[in-house]
Amino acid sequence: MNLQLQSDICNLKSQIKITGSKSETNRLLLLQALFPNITLANTSNSDDSEVMQKALKGNDEIVDIHHAGTAMRFLTAYFAVNEGREVVLTGSPRMKERPIKVLVEALQQLGAQISYENEEGYPPIRIKGQKITANKVNIPANVSSQYISALLLIAPKLENGIELTLVGEITSIPYIKMTLALLNEIGVETSFEGNVINVKPLTTHERQRIGEANPKPQTLTVESDWSSASYFFSIVALAEIGTEITLSSYKQNSLQGDSSLVEIYKNLGVDTVFENNSIVLRKSVTPNPQLSNCNLNSSPDIAQTIVATCLGLGIGCHLTGLHTLKIKETDRLEALRMELTKLGANISVTNDSLTLVATKDINPNVKIATYNDHRMAMAFAPLALKAPIIIENAEVVSKSYPDFWEDLKRLGFIMERV
């Protein structure tokens, strides 16, 4: 499905409810599978979270997670400690191109039985679940934080917990801290000192409290997704002064790294006010003429949104810390270069950075390829406030935000299938 979008005016005051964070939901789903008396509220309705939940509840020998990268990493660790079960974990053609070797080797250090079905280092992989007693493991610090989180999430189930040493410079710290905070929330003792993370096994008392006997259930509420909020920050930035969008449900002391949006978008003319469990976004000032040296090492998922916003505002930007974007749903840096160039942008990329030169005009009615990447579709959509735009394969948004197009209609966007 291709959608043509246009909007001359965004409704000046709107309210949108966004479902729970995909990142938090997927972590908590794994913990719930390990400790069944945990119950969850406000979980994500994304395809990725549904795939994760289905895989955790199912009994299939072949587990296909399609495009869900988080599920691939987390389930690799989960099935490694699921005693007595053997599975083949596979995914889409793109997933089979995304490396898994670093995580597999780390789990093998602990004693896990994992082998490759085809090419070494890549899915599909065969996992034979077993009891793991080793607890010391090293992993490169500059890899995807999902590898690190996968190991941390299974740690309270291990007989001796885990002592994880991160080798080199650490990236994506907020996602690691999110995982540790969620473990703390269910009563797991953790520490993160220097480059060493310790996660203790749950005591007998704590195991009973969260579900290994028959205790009173514990309910955890998932905060709404900040990555999904980013598209509304972009819409407000590109709209006229006075535009206001209220989003729920959000915390000022969020665990999500993408909450850095609040400070970044101040430079782009958006004020954020926390009211009860909501955030109110207001377009109040003219943006700065340049967004310089914006380091997204801790929040790379909002890079596409930010650069599209800057193009729409006619300002330049220089974004760094983007090295993980090359192994996402697509090579996001190259995809951005290709699609922004179609719109008339002057853009250059390296392995870990992006530079956009200020451009006054945007080419209208350009077809934006989405590369099976939900964030490409959603990041470019707000540009319809500046020029009509066509989003190819628009249904890809269901990976993280199935209601996205309906929510844009509520804001006054006009869309037509083409």
What are these regions (language model features)?
Residues 1-418:
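Short, structured segments at the rim of ligand-binding sites
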